[in-house]
Amino acid sequence: MESSPSSPQPTQSDPLAVFPQRTLEPADIAVLVLYFLFVLAVGLWSTVKTRRDTVKGYFLAGGDMVWWPVGASLFASNVGSGHFVGLAGSGAAAGLSVTAYEFNGIFSVLMLAWIFLPIYIAGQVDMYAGAIFIQQSLHLNLYLAIVGLLAITALYTIAGGLAAVIYTDALQTLIMLIGALTLMGYSFAAVGGMEGLKEKYFLALASNRSGNSSCGLPREDAFHIFRDPLTSDLPWPGILFGMSIPSLWYWCTDQVIVQRTLAAKNLSHAKGGSLMAAYLKVLPLFIMVFPGMVSRVLFPDQVACADPEICQKVCSNPAGCSDIAYPKLVLELLPMGLRGLMMAVMVAALMSSLTSIFNSASTIFTMDLWNHLRPRASERELMIVGRVFVLLLVMVSILWIPVVQASQGGQLFIYIQSISSYLQPPVAVVFIMGCFWKRTNEKGAFSGLILGLLLGLIRLVLDFIYPQPRCDQPDERPAVVRDVHYLYFSMILSSVTLVTVSTVSWCTAPPTQEMVSRLTWFTRHDPIVLKEQVPSATPVPVTVSQNGTPEASSTNIQFEIVQENTSKTHSCDMTKKQSKVVKTILWLCGMESKGKEEPPSRADPVIVSLEEIPLVKTLLDINLIVCISCAIFLWGYFA
C-alpha cells in the first residue's frame, strides 16, 4: 500500500521496532516537566483553598463543588490511559464497535444523576497502560518511572483529599482534550479525512501475513456498531442488554464515580456535572477509536501484524500488537513539542485514574472498615488512617505492575470488559432491585450475590484455563466458553441473579418500613428520623475529659464521626513542643493544631436537599432530553 505524502516514513534501521529510536526531545521533556509542576501547583492550591481537617472536608471535598469540576472529574476518572491504549487498540483490530461502551455510558451517567443520586442523598449515604508510554517514550526503568509518577500523585492526594483530586482532574481533562483533539487532527490529515480512512482501512494488511489465511484481515463490519448476533466479536443483543448491566454498576454504584457527585454542593450541580460528563463521552470515538484505526493504516506491519513470531518480536505479545496503535501514532506522527504534550495527556489520564482510586479506596477503608473496628476513633485518627492507607496503595500499585503486564491479552480494553462481565452483573442486579423493589430483603440479596458471583468466578476460571486460541489455531475450548460470548454470559448471570433474589425475597419475611425508609426510589421523600430520637436500651457512654467536661459520643448517619476529646490544655502543650518540621507535615496533612481549640460539637450530617430551583431544574431537564437525543442519533448513525 502506498503511503500518502503526509504519512510518516518507515524507519529503515529496524522495520520490526515498535518504538524506533525516536524518543522525546528536550522540548518534549520541558512540556512534560511544566505539566507536572502545573498539576502539583493546582493540587497544593486546592489544599489551601479547602478545609481538610474534617472527615467531610477530606473525603467529600466539603460537599461544596460546583458542576464543572464535578463533570470534568467524572470524565477524567473514567478515561484513564487504559482507554487511550485499549480503545485505540480495539479500533485498530476490529473497528468502531467498541465505541458502544462509551455511548452506553452516556445513558448510565445520566441515570446516576436523575435516578440513583436522589436515593443516595435521601439515604445519606490503570497502571500498565500508562507504563507503556512512560517506559517506551522515555526509555526509563519501568519501576523508576512508576515510583516517580506515584510519588507525585500520592503527594497531592494525601495532602488535599477529594478536593485536590477533583481540581486536578479538571485540569487534566482540559489537557487530555487539547492533546487528543490535536492528535486527531494530525491523524485524519495523514489519511485524507474520514473518506480516506474508510477507503484505506480495508487495505491495511500486514505484508508478512500468509496469503491463504484470514488472520489479520480487517473486519467487513468495521464501521458498524451493531454486528451479527452469533459470529461477531460484539453481538448486537449483547451490546444492548449484556453491556448495560455492568455499565449501570460502574456509573451508578462505583465508589470512584459516585463520590464525585456526592461532593457537589447540591443536586442541581450534581446533575450539571453528570450532563457535562455525558457530553464528553461522545468524544472517545473521535479522539481514541478513529486514531487507532488510522494507526493501522499508517503502520500495518506493526499494528496489524498477524504472524505470532513477528508479533512477539514487535510487541512481545504473540496474540497481536493492536494495543501499540496509539503510542505508535503519538511517537511517529507528532512533531517535537506536541509529543511532549501527548505524553502529558497520557500521564494526565493515568494520574486522574490513580488519584480517584487512591481517594475512594481510602474512604472505604477508613469510614467502613476502620470506623467499624474502632467506633470511638477520633477525627484526627481517621485522617491519619486515611492518608496512611493511600501510602499502602502506592506500594501495592508498584508491586502489581508486572502481574498486569504478564496477564493482559491482545486487546487490553476487551480483556478488561470481559472480566467485568463475569463479576459486576450480580452486584448491579442486587443493587438495582434494592433501590426499586421494596420487597427485596437481606436474605434474597445475599443468596443472589453468592450464586451470581460463584457462577461468574467459575466462568472466569474457565477463561483462564482455556484461553482464546490464536487465529491460526483450532478452537478446542468447551462449548460454554467457546460459544457463549461474555456479553451473553452477562445477560444470563443477570437473569439468574434476578430470579434468585426475587424467589428468596418472596419466600422470606419482608423488610420493615424502617429498613427501607429513604433508601429506595419510592421512599426517598419519607421524613427523616434521626437515630438519636429512638430511645436506646443502654445508656450512651459518657467520657470525662481531663478538664472535667462530660462529652457524649455522637454518631453520624453516613460517616459516624466521633469528636476528639483531647483537652485544650494538652493541645496547647503539644503545640509548643512541635518543631517546624512536624508543623509542616501536619499542615500538609490538614491536621495542624489550632491555637484556640473549639469545644466539641456535633458534626453536620452530610445531607444535600432534594429541592431544586424550578428554573434550574427545567433547564437541566431540557438539557437531559437534548443529550439523550444526541446519544440516540449517534447510536442510529453508526449502528
Predicted regions located by residue number:
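Membrane-embedded helix-loop-helix hairpins and adjacent transmembrane boundary segments
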Residues: 1-639
